């Protein structure tokens, strides 16, 4: 029996202690009983909870309120405080202040009857009967307010003395003595929560998804806060949420109603469920880690910082469906054609139970089989049970599931295990459900009707629990009169006579003592075990664990023990692969266990090695998240298997399997320990059957049954018998169990010593402080870090071994074991004496073990080493020397699957055993595949040292020795990755020496230390030029300081020096320019110093002679760009000349010695002009279009105001007085630009170019004013991700045969540069219309947007500025890193979504190529169309070089030859100063800058063009790969330095033929020429150039192809780019190719793509024929004929007939040889037909000349007649846009056959941009001119075409053609 109420309290307003403005305090007026009960202390702070919103006086008479507050005491017992609050008139106001009264202040005195103070009647109980308490308090209030003639003292005394029965379904009728009759109904089960209707109400308030989120939040220990305007609703919501957790119990702060004064509790770090009134919601919204539920608004707010774990599928979906069926039954029939009249919901009480039943089923499924994972540690005196979490998660298949992991680690689940773990206790509904009904739940999930039926069955039981007696007795409780609280004169609540109440309570208690106690005896039973744990998802058993694989493991073990070495070697690799499966690992432990039982544990050395390898392989995958079963099963085996090393010295297996992190995972040891203890306890009670000394332990079971009894079954029996045993017997049992646990603890301490103390104590890999960071897994980091940290602490003085050299190892092991012993022994109830004795034993065990291991270690080193593969010496290149001899390593796969067998098939070439070599040129691995079945193949992976981009130390799993090894991962810019694990024999010192040597050769002190100069010659000394003293003193000093500052990473001195040379404006602009000096380590002062007169080593005359021989000048002569002449000998026709003013590199350090400038410019003015450009890179001509006469110019970006400001300020006075230096520079620059512009225009006129004349289609008035500046660049990221369309202006520009042929020549050039491809809307903006009407400029200046933003240039200057944005260097570097990660990922990605193509797309590489090619194509098109181009982007040596060189390649066929491409690279890249050394990090000072593949991007762009136009290039793709490889290899001197000036300084610019001793390294071009002469290795057999306009490749991202250079690999000999230089007899992979004799030997050979060089193994037909001819000539002793002479003979014989101007060429390749291999888009016409005029009929067909595939229209035109019926009429019409109303010219075709009016961007366009169906045309009528129409157009030229959908507005060229169009269309409509 229990008291119904513990305390009754009256709490009122405290007038004496005001809390603050507008707020008061409450105080306890009376409490009953006055003394605390012994078992229940009086709750503190009850006055705060009576008024949670604060104590306030009121002006209104308010209704009485009731709510229940829950308080939790220090023992976690809950007290339910029911509060009934009413307001009574306040008579005495002397103690109050005006501020305390609610409402506004009013004038005059407040009448006493107008103020009301709250008073609360509180009932405190440990029982949860809210409705009974509401009735009792209501009754007391009724007696008071209605002045009933009943003593309040007797009511209170009866209430405090009333006793009610405990749970069990019994009823109790009672009365307080005021004419009431009340019934208390106790629930059937104490453990089941009582909810009434609160759960249904919560779902009604918040909805299914929100409640599920709150449910998951509470289970995963998040903070949950409710707020509502109702206190009772807060109580109900908290009660509901807590009840949904059943069978778990909430063990954190639970405060359904939180008072205002305690709001700071919300900031506590612990999880909670709290409710607050809505008036405080503004205060709680600032909480960052609290999930807030608004009960009144029906919403929940989950902060961003909280990752809310959700239920695992399929349970989440099933729960949602079940809840939906119950709460919204009408949803299922909502779509029925004939829905039922109404779908009845269950009444709220039953609905409440149905919802709870759903959650009960959910927990039954979630915890299915939990009892099979309980570990019994102790039975007596109290059961100690542990839950095997990892086993449960592993068997459920939810190891990775966040939700269940958090639930199992929570305090609620710990309580669940301790409460429900014991096998003999009272059972409830959940126990039955989880044991017997889970299978039924799973089966019924797919049948909603059966599921609902089961839910309702469970709901009935839950309902019956709360309402066990359906026929309840009549209840009567008087209620106050209606409106009684509004009475004017109500006396205050009377003071209760305390003595009388106390007396009555004592009398009632005395009566109850005599009554018999109606206590309910708890019925205990054996808890059913239930089904075993199964996976939550029904997964099909994978083939991985098939019977064949298990058989392989068994056979391998049999072969090992039978000493069948050959069979073992064959099966071992397959067995090791099979051990990745759990079943195979289990099979291994079972088989080894059998051999131990057969006393076959002594092994010879070979057997020992095999067994160790298999054990290591098995342990390799035992992570901390697995169930540890395998590692636990191997644990005793490691101490069983051993080999004899010497008499009395044996080596056990545990010494060789210590390198696995699982041995330092304390959770593993605990779990394994508990399992072992459980088995021992089970054995203890099973063996007791035959023990005569302990008769009470005998089991009354047949002999056959006791083996089947589990530990839990035995425990249940023991717990049942426990109360019947005598005290001595009980004590004996407790001692037996404790000794069992103690002995296991000693045993485990020994096992842990075995596995934690290393064989060589100087190499402790697991417990050394430096190790854990590399190998530990996340779950055991706490343990390992604490061990590692503890090494540094004071040593354990008890051990006595602190002064030995191994003391750190010994102490770290002792601490680890001591921590383990403390935890498991304390949990298992071992006495402190036993624990202390264990602590004393451990140091001795460790010390003895270390001593034993010293002998083992000594003897093991004397063993003959295991036969390892012989180290193969690598083949070296001429002049290459080995620096570091081979270090024995294991080459691991680099993340690509090709060489690993696996899913792609093929041999498993990797991992491979071999050696890592370092030579003066390469880092090189050579070895053989570890897989014996692959054969005797040699695996070679190498790359040049200079190409290394990243080198890092790694720790990796050595797959051969199955152990963790130190390793090295080296990445190369040649897209190779060497990832090796060092063998045990390689010491760390040797590895460090290797790395130091590697770094020494990676960043040599000077270029003469590189391999390019290492072919046996002496290092030439660098003789710095001597300068005149007067010029030298300050400059030399300054430069020295600046270089020193640059090394120290500071730029201050260089900037100060600049300040002295230039104005502050210029310097500040340079330094603060966005991106300036962020990524580039280029010194500000290095290339920007003012030119000085410098005297170089060579005399000026000899320098001039050598400069004239350079590629630059030869190309100027080829292009006819003027001659070298003084000012006096200028020839009139020349408007440009070649100046030698930079021959000593005094004008610009990064420019070539000879420059092309306007004839009118004096050399003396050039230095001042140069100052206006970054690094003095002034604008110079670099190429001329031989067809149009247009020029391409390049320069660095502008300084200061830039070119725009200069043009603008020509006629305006200077606003600010500047220095004479800037003034003169600005003036000279203005003159220079004016001369440049004049020369460009006149030059083009002299060339006879008609491109600047206005075309007839554009014969409109010029528009005065300024250019519209819409040529802007969008954000690189956003533009890259926009879909690129083939429509609109872009398509028209791209697909026209000549840009000039289209009237829309320069529409939207800027938009194209910005990456914006407009769709086929007829007019995108009015600015396009304006652009159309402007005449073409003579010069287009492509500059940075930031420099040209304010460009408003007068039209008279005849030039236009095109602002362009481009990718910065840091973006290029980042993209390259991502590209490398995609192509050589280093590890095979575990995430199936991270595919190669996705990674390639994420790298942003292709959008960057797209941007470069797009810019180059536009430049090329502008040049073709008669306008010159000046490119001045960034410093002028990165993107500028990419664009100018690519534009020249597209426009000039010469550069597409081998000799021409060399000229292009030498001129644009080498002479014009691309920073090769810096961008490729070749120099020592660019070490930290990162690799920027600017030149590689250019080569990739050339590769893209080559793909689309394979017949236009003399060289093949191998040539580009060769350059890509060697520009970073340092094999050649060509790409070593950053400018011609530096090359001249180092003496490598000119080959000094006179000095025989000073060899200056090898030039790549000479090497290429020799190779090209010797063989067609670089020749493109499809080469068949057509002398027409520039190439126009398709630059859409979708058209770009992945370059196979990034992914190809040749493991047989390494990259072929080094060996191809040598004669074929030196090829390392040609050795096996020589066939002996002409016998009938098979010529068949297996070709593996990742192993063999396919081009050599399977050459194309022509290469094969050439090699056959060479062999035949050799056999006939003839002098071999040069291959190109032979090729010319063949091609001459197959020449086709001469072509006429109108004939079409059908094949781009040579007929009979390659024409079939050329795709259709590569077959181009030799000469294009003349361009059509306006309104002309077309009578000839054209094939597209670009890289775009044939459109459907073109295919259609090939097969249909071209008579008037097909294209009856065509010509240009202006069409008005539907949306933006702009006029645009389009090429219209009237097609009678198809009854269509089609329109194109131009007459040559093959892609139809749209059509008008003539069937929809209603009329065609003349129209008047409208706004924005083309000027100078006749009013009669307009007509409208009205269709059923819209009206089209057209404008013809004149009235006559408009009438002609109307007639044609009208006749077409009439004919139809």
Curated annotation (Swiss-Prot):
The modification Phosphoserine is found at residues 1125, 1302. Residues 191-324 form the cDENN domain. It is found in: Cytoplasm; Cytoplasm, Perinuclear region; Membrane; Endosome membrane. Residues 1766-1870 form the PH domain. Disruption phenotype: Mice are born at the expected Mendelian rate. Display demyelinating peripheral neuropathy characterized by slowed nerve conduction velocity, axon degeneration, and myelin outfolding and infolding in motor and sensory peripheral nerves. Defects in myelination start to appear at postnatal day 3 (P3). The neuropathy severity increases with age. No impact on Mtmr5 protein levels in mouse brain or sciatic nerves. Double knockout animals with Mtmr5 are non-viable, dying during late gestation or within a few hours of birth. Gene3D superfamilies: 3.30.450.200, 3.40.50.11500, Pleckstrin-homology domain (PH domain)/Phosphotyrosine-binding domain (PTB). SUPFAM superfamilies: (Phosphotyrosine protein) phosphatases II, PH domain-like. One of its GO terms (molecular function) is identical protein binding. Residues 1697-1720 are annotated as: Disordered. One of its GO terms (cellular component) is cytosol. Keywords: Autophagy, Cell projection, Cytoplasm, Endosome, Guanine-nucleotide releasing factor, Membrane, Phosphoprotein. It is a peripheral membrane protein. Residues 1652-1705 are annotated as: Required for homodimerization and interaction with MTMR2. The keyword Phosphoprotein applies. Residues 7-172 form the uDENN domain. Homodimer. Heterotetramer consisting of one MTMR2 dimer and one SBF2/MTMR13 dimer; stabilizes SBF2/MTMR13 at the membranes and increases MTMR2 catalytic activity towards phosphatidylinositol 3,5-bisphosphate and to a lesser extent towards phosphatidylinositol 3-phosphate. Interacts with SBF1/MTMR5; the interaction seems to be independent of the coiled-coil and PH domain of SBF2/MTMR13 and independent of MTMR2. Interacts with class II PI3-kinase PIK3C2A. Interacts (via DENN domain) with RAB21 (in GDP-bound form) in response to starvation; the interaction activates RAB21. PANTHER family: MYOTUBULARIN-RELATED, MYOTUBULARIN-RELATED PROTEIN 13. The C-terminal domain mediates homodimerization. By mediating SBF2/MTMR13 homodimerization, indirectly involved in SBF2/MTMR13 and MTMR2 homotetramerization. This is Myotubularin-related protein 13. It comes from Mus musculus. The lineage of its organism: Eukaryota, Metazoa, Chordata, Craniata, Vertebrata.
